[in-house]
């Protein structure tokens, strides 16, 4: 073959094979690809699609299995975990049932979570979605306003879910949406007002169709809708909505309804223990939510009401030490990476829990307390090669000075790895 023929002979731009060595060569603008490379690329793409998160609802875990998983991350709240496990199981069982073309069509049951700040409402919803391997989105009800006013449209909630599902609409339509601070969209008074309540009752009205199940038009870039843009169509019929809120003040409404109206010497005296918020919330009725400011139609679309208890000292100590992502375990690991052993004594844990109770922040405030307490020592430790152990005692919350113990020989040694995990050895003295 002449050199001129070699130049004229076409080759695949990817594997370099000539047109004589392959069955077909497809031309593009200044580039060629053979049938073998096309087949290889197709296999790679198919493998990637198979590796994507699949929403497998055929092998749905039982309520006991769901609760067992929740127990690993959420301390206490036994009644809430059982109620949520059953509700989620029934929701996805309903999706499977409605695809079988039965005579009976099961309706959706969204969930309302009531509990004090820091009691675990958001964590429960997040953990459920993680276990079920379904797309999950968190929305803040305080940013929502009625259509036509400054703020977010309710459809933006669905956009977050679609984005978390990598724009796979079919996957997103079986996801979970958690709407936080739902109590903040309660209408301002029980009586209808002549002025529009655009961030209260107006938002409740806008959420009704989405909660019930509708084909919603979602702007792909978020923000307000305008007539000259394309929309993403998503059916919300099989999306599970969990709405959570602290509902500050609803306890007084429940008290007024439940207490016996008696005066004088025969009046019943309630102790502070009897007025525990978590116990009061268990007696909540739809009428109490109505008086709080939720409209009847909105209450009707959240038929499952789950209440959470206020966390006491014992529960907060368990939260600090027991879950897989416990704060004490996290800080111990951070110190271990600097070859320093960290120890919290029991009295210190009690003080941290009491401080969280005093601040009325629940479990959410634990990290802030520990971070404030450990800031100085975490700043100094990497530079102090002679420190081998740090002990946090009950005085550390006030003094912010843990007890420091020098390493043997004046210089710390690498902490021995646990369970066979390899660590890089640092220089020793």
Swiss-Prot record:
It holds the Pfam family AAA_2. Keywords: ATP-binding, Chaperone, Metal-binding, Nucleotide-binding, Zinc. Zn(2+) binds at residues 12, 15, 34, 37. CDD domains: RecA-like_ClpX (cd19497). Residues 1-53 form the ClpX-type ZB domain. Belongs to the ClpX chaperone family. Component of the ClpX-ClpP complex. Forms a hexameric ring that, in the presence of ATP, binds to fourteen ClpP subunits assembled into a disk-like structure with a central cavity, resembling the structure of eukaryotic proteasomes. ATP-dependent specificity component of the Clp protease. It directs the protease to specific substrates. Can perform chaperone functions in the absence of ClpP. This is ATP-dependent Clp protease ATP-binding subunit ClpX. It comes from Clostridium botulinum (strain Hall / ATCC 3502 / NCTC 13319 / Type A). The lineage of its organism: Bacteria, Bacillati, Bacillota, Clostridia, Eubacteriales.
């Amino acid at each position: 073959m002449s050199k001129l023929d070699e130049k004229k002979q076409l080759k695949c731009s990817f594997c370099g094979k000539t047109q004589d060595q392959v069955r077909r060569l497809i031309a593009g603008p200044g580039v060629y690809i053979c049938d073998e490379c096309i087949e290889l690329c197709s296999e790679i793409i198919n493998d990637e699609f198979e590796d994507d998160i699949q929403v497998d609802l055929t092998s749905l875990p039982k309520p006991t299995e769901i609760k067992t998983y929740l127990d690993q991350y959420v301390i206490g709240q036994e009644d809430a975990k059982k109620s949520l496990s059953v509700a989620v199981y029934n929701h996805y069982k309903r999706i499977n049932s409605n695809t079988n073309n039965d005579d009976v069509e099961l309706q959706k049951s969204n969930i309302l979570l009531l509990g004090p700040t820091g009691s675990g409402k958001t964590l429960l919803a997040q953990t459920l979605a993680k276990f079920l391997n379904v797309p999950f989105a968190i929305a803040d009800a305080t940013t929502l306003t009625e259509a036509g006013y400054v703020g977010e449209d309710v459809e933006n909630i669905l956009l977050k879910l679609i984005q978390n599902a990598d724009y796979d609409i079919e996957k997103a339509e079986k996801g979970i949406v958690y709407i936080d601070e739902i109590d903040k969209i309660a209408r301002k008074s029980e009586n209808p007002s002549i002025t529009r309540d655009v961030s209260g009752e107006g938002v409740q009205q806008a959420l009704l169709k989405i909660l019930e199940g509708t084909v919603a038009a979602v702007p792909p870039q978020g923000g307000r809708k305008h007539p000259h843009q394309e929309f993403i169509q998503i059916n919300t019929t099989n999306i599970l909505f969990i709405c959570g809120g602290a509902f500050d003040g609803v306890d007084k409404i429940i008290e007024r309804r439940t207490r016996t109206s008696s005066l004088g010497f025969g009046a019943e005296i309630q102790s502070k223990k009897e007025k525990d918020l978590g116990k009061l919330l268990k007696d909540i009725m739809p009428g109490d939510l109505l008086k709080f400011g939720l409209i009847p139609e909105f209450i009707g679309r959240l038929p499952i009401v789950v209440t959470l208890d206020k966390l006491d000292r014992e529960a907060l100590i368990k939260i600090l030490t027991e879950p897989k992502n416990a704060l004490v375990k996290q800080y111990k690991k951070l110190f271990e990476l600097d070859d320093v052993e960290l120890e919290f004594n029991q009295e210190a844990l009690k003080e941290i829990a009491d401080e969280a109770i005093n601040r009325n922040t629940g479990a959410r405030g634990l990290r802030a307390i520990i971070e404030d307490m450990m800031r100085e020592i975490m700043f100094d430790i990497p530079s102090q090669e002679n420190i081998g152990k740090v002990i946090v005692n009950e005085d550390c919350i006030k003094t912010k000075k843990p007890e420091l113990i020098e390493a043997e020989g004046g210089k710390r040694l690498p902490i021995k790895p646990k369970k066979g995990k390899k660590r890089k050895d640092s220089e020793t003295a």
